[in-house]
Curated annotation (Swiss-Prot):
PANTHER family: NUCLEAR FUSION PROTEIN KAR5
Protein name per the record: Nuclear fusion protein KAR5
Induction comment from the UniProt entry of this chain: By mating pheromone. Expression is directly controlled by STE12 as cells respond to mating pheromone.
Annotated compartments: Endoplasmic reticulum membrane; Nucleus membrane
Subunit-level organization: Interacts with PRM3.
Annotated transmembrane regions: 453-470, 482-502
Gene expressing this chain: KAR5
Similarity comment: Belongs to the KAR5 family.
Pfam families, A to Z: Tht1
Sugar-bearing residue positions: 159, 206, 313, 404
Signal peptide per UniProt: 1-19
A cellular component annotation (GO) from this entry: endoplasmic reticulum membrane
Organism: Saccharomyces cerevisiae (strain ATCC 204508 / S288c)
Length: 504
């Protein structure tokens, strides 16, 4: 990450110092090689480089020496030679302490120089000095070649140093402007990114709130519907149980009356007809009970199917809504990821190649200096980028936590729906168990009524309860009672053997 930012900054800086800037720098360098500019302190340079000190001989050779070294002595015109020889002669006169110097030779003018020559001819000493200097111009040219080259090299170095100084100032200005522009662009990008995430968060909140309201309404409607169905079922079951209980009590009373009548008939010896009538009535009543039990069973089966259908429809609807919400959430996450990937691809595929292609070979020599100057800048940028990364990561973590909270709420709703379904199924199993128990009791009663031994046992119990006495003395029972008991036992035995008395 650090290397990518470093290359990115280096490419941006190099972009601003590209072809047009290099052309300006080349022109400026050529101009400084031709036209000298003493921008460095003269005293310091003359103390470090004595050959730079201004002397009379140096001033005299100022025009002659560059042309002679560059193009040779033959390229110099006669006027320049004469002027140079005159100036060298004047320098010798001044160095020797000669008091009388021609006045026309002290003026730097072509007409004065001609007058100066006429005056030099007037004195043999002056003319000899002038003639010797004129003849030594070729040797003077080669004798001053090395000092002249040193001076030119030093001037070139000073020009390059000044060029580097101005280039550094330009680079600092460009970097400051670039940093300011980058900060503005980064701030605008962060503002746009924060605005985008706020809009995304608001949309996600609104969608979650609307889905939560829809789910709550559906759950409330289903709960009310289930409560209504259960309430109606419980009321109908209670009414039917009360009816069955009353019918059972009536049947018990009827059986009790029948048993009383049977006892009376037994006393009157009219048993067979009463038993047959009782049998027919009991069969009819049991058939009615069986039909009613079948009706109740069909009613509960219909209610059970209705409740199961409602639960299945609600479960399917809830699964579809949860699937739609999960799909929307996944699509939103994919859009955010595609946006970040698009920004990353734009950065790596468009910006970096276009900037790195403009790096010119001439800037390679400046890389080490720029690296040292940019170390402090990169450290500051690293802190800023780290802070931006932390803010972006914290925003993503908040969004992930909110999504996890929404998922937990949906899981809680699903658990509650499963608990409601479980409670309804438990209630249905309890009702089914009650129905099976009541059916078994009715079946046992029906089988008991049909069994001849049950009637025999009831008859014995009834007779025993009717004729029992505390501590009966056998001797006190009359003989008539023995005959009656014997007749009763004989009839019971014969009925059990032949099946003619109690038969279906």
């Amino acid at each position: 990450m650090f290397e990518m930012r470093y290359v990115y900054l280096f490419a941006i800086c190099i972009k601003f110092v590209s072809s047009s800037e290099l052309g300006k720098i080349n022109n400026l360098l050529q101009g400084r090689l031709i036209y000298t500019d003493n921008s460095v302190a003269t005293n310091v340079l003359e103390s470090k480089f004595p050959f730079l000190k201004s002397t009379c001989v140096k001033d005299a050779l100022k025009l002659f020496l560059p042309q002679c070294i560059a193009n040779g002595l033959e390229s110099i015109d006669a006027e320049t030679r004469v002027e140079t020889a005159i100036k060298l002669s004047i320098c010798e006169f001044q160095a020797s302490g000669l008091g009388e110097i021609p006045e026309n030779c002290m003026v730097d003018d072509l007409g004065s120089m001609m007058d100066c020559m006429f005056e030099l001819e007037s004195s043999s000493q002056w003319w000899t000095t002038y003639s010797g200097n004129y003849q030594r111009l070729s040797s003077i040219c080669y004798e001053n070649l090395l000092p002249f080259e040193k001076e030119q090299i030093l001037k070139l170095f000073l020009n390059i140093t000044e060029l580097y100084d101005s280039f550094g100032d330009d680079v600092d200005t460009k970097l400051n402007h670039l940093m300011f522009q980058m900060e503005q662009d980064s701030q605008n990008f962060l503002d746009d990114l924060a605005r985008m995430f706020r809009n995304y968060d608001n949309e996600l909140r609104n969608a979650t709130e609307s889905n939560r309201i829809i789910l709550e309404n559906d759950l409330s409607f289903f709960r009310n519907k289930v409560n209504d169905v259960l309430y109606e079922t419980s009321e109908q079951l209670e009414v039917q149980i009360i009816e069955k209980n009353s019918q059972l009590m009536n049947e018990v009373d009827t059986v009790h009356h029948i048993m009383s009548d049977l006892a009376d008939e037994l006393a009157k010896n009219d048993i067979k007809s009463k038993i047959n009538d009782l049998k027919d009535d009991s069969l009819n009543n049991l058939q009615d009970l069986v039909e009613m039990s079948n009706d109740v069973k069909e009613y509960y089966s219909r209610n059970n199917k209705l409740v199961n259908t409602e639960l299945e429809n609600f479960s399917m609807g809830l699964k579809k809504q949860l699937g739609g919400m999960s799909k929307d959430l996944s699509e939103s996450q994919m859009e955010a990821i595609e946006l970040l990937q698009g920004f990353n691809s734009i950065l790596h595929d468009s910006l970096l190649p276009s900037m790195t292609d403009e790096i010119v070979p001439e800037m390679t020599n400046f890389k080490n200096t720029l690296l040292q100057e940019w170390t402090a800048i990169t450290s500051t940028l690293n802190g800023d980028f780290a802070l931006w990364n932390e803010e972006i990561f914290s925003t993503f973590n908040d969004i992930s936590e909110k999504l996890n909270g929404t998922k937990k709420k949906l899981d809680d709703i699903e658990i509650r729906v499963s608990l409601v379904h479980k409670n309804v199924m438990t209630m249905m199993r309890v009702l089914d168990f009650m129905w099976k128990t009541s059916k078994m009791i009715i079946r046992c009663g029906y089988l008991a009524v049909k069994n001849k031994y049950y009637w025999l046992l009831c008859s014995v119990v009834w007779i025993w309860s009717k004729y029992r006495t505390s501590r009966v003395n056998v001797k006190m029972i009359p003989i008539k009672r023995y005959y009656q008991w014997a007749a009763l036992l004989l009839s019971i035995y014969l009925g059990a053997k032949t099946g003619s008395l109690i038969d279906f």
